[in-house]
Structure formats: C-alpha cells, structure tokens
Amino acid sequence: MSKEPSSVALVTGANRGIGFEVCRQLASRGFVVLVTARDEAKAKTAARKLANAGAVEPVLLDVADPSSIKNAQSEIATKYGLLDVLVNNAGINYDTWETAENADIGGVMETITTNLLGPWRLCQAFLPLLRKSKAARIVNVSSESGSLAHMGVGPPAYQVTKAALNALTRTLAGELRHAHILVNAVCPGWVATDMGGAGAPRSVEEGAAGVVWAATLPQNGLTGGFFRDGKPLPW
C-alpha cells in the first residue's frame, strides 16, 4: 500500500516569533511546512533550525510584493500541485505611539499593504491549490486589537487593519463554505516576541498553539470564527 502523502502547509512571516513556532508545531505533526520569509537567507536559516522538527522547506515570499507571491505560487504549484493549509501570519505594527489624528498616512498604507492586502493576495493566489486539497484550511493571524467590541485607544493602523482582516475572514468563510475550506481568524494573545516585547505574558508556544489548532480542525470544524486558544472572541 502506498503511503499517504503528507499535507502541505505554508506559513508567512515564518523566520521568527509566532510564525517560526507554528512551523515547528506543524512539522512535528507530519506536515510538509513551507517556511517563508521576504529575505531568502532568513527563510533558509529558519528552515535549517527547524529541520529536526520534520519536513520543512524555505520559500522566498514577500507578502507586500505581488510578483513575489506569484513566483512562490508557481514554485509550489510545480512541486506539490496543491496546498492544504495557508497561515497568513506576516504582519507589521509600526504605529504604536501614534493616534488616528496624527498617524503618518504613508505608514498606514504600508500597514494596509502588509496586514490586509498581503493575506488577501495570498488567498487569491493560493485558492486554486487549496481547492485541490481534501481538507483545506486558511488561518488569518489577527489580534484582539481588531475586535470592535474591545477596540479603544491603540495603534491605529494596526488595529484597523486587523479589524479589516477579520472582515475578510468572514467574507471568505462565507464564499468558501460549500468548497469545504475552513477560514478562521486567530488571536495568539500578547506573546513575548520581537513585536510583543519581552514583558508579554504568553510564550511563543502558547500563542502558536491556537493557530495550529485552527490549521488542523476536522472536516466538520468551525469556520468564519475569531478565536483565541480555541475559544470564540467577539468581532
């Protein structure tokens, strides 16, 4: 009997922090994990560090560059023919000390390009490959900062783009429900990463676990939701 092929997962922003740990956890579960970064050397370094966890492969991918997305999609389509899991993890937060009133619009546009249009373009590019999977999953790494129920004063471009990412999640989940592709947003919580800072209360392992949970939901699993640690959050 031939061995069932391993499921293929792509993780953006995977060279450090939550993305790196998501790759480690997925690889340890038997996935072939495509470790992406916008710097090819960093993707290769991350893949080397993850080699003991399982099957990993570095892929050059800049979510803010449409040509980079196209090249990565072509490479993956040629080598694997499908994609089972897409984790949109890459994101930026450059406006921590700004307000909506005085925000630099150039920085806002950069944040929109990475945090919203990046995942949107990735979904558009990889949906043909995800449709070939028997159990495809899309996980958008969001933040409670993007919850309208909890939103207040905070980094304006970051939280507005995360709210928009949540809206994209709901839209895609509705469109893809009958295609058996589950689409969810996950808040990893305040995690001790380069972005979250050393004083954050949650470990990278804890933050990544909720993302991996959504990436490995069963066929009849939830879709169109916003979760932390597998529990619903308000939009």
Please report, for each region that a protein language model flagged, where it lies by residue.
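Canonical Rossmann dinucleotide-binding motif of NAD(H)/NADP(H)-dependent dehydrogenases/reductases
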Residues: 2-34
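Rossmann-fold scaffold of SDR-type NAD(P)-dependent oxidoreductases
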Residues: 12, 83-91, 115, 140, ...
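Conserved glycine-rich Rossmann-like NAD(P)H-binding loop of the short-chain dehydrogenase/reductase
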Residues: 29-45
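The beta1-alpha1 cofactor-binding region of Rossmann-like NAD(H)/NADP(H)-dependent oxidoreductases
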Residues: 40-41, 60-74
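A glycine-rich helix->loop->beta "capping" turn
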Residues: 53-55, 75-88, 94-96, 182
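Conserved residues in the N-terminal Rossmann fold of short-chain dehydrogenase/reductase
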Residues: 59-60, 113
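Catalytic loop of short-chain dehydrogenase/reductase
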Residues: 92-112, 117-124, 131-178
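C-terminal helical subdomain
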Residues: 178, 185-188, 197-235
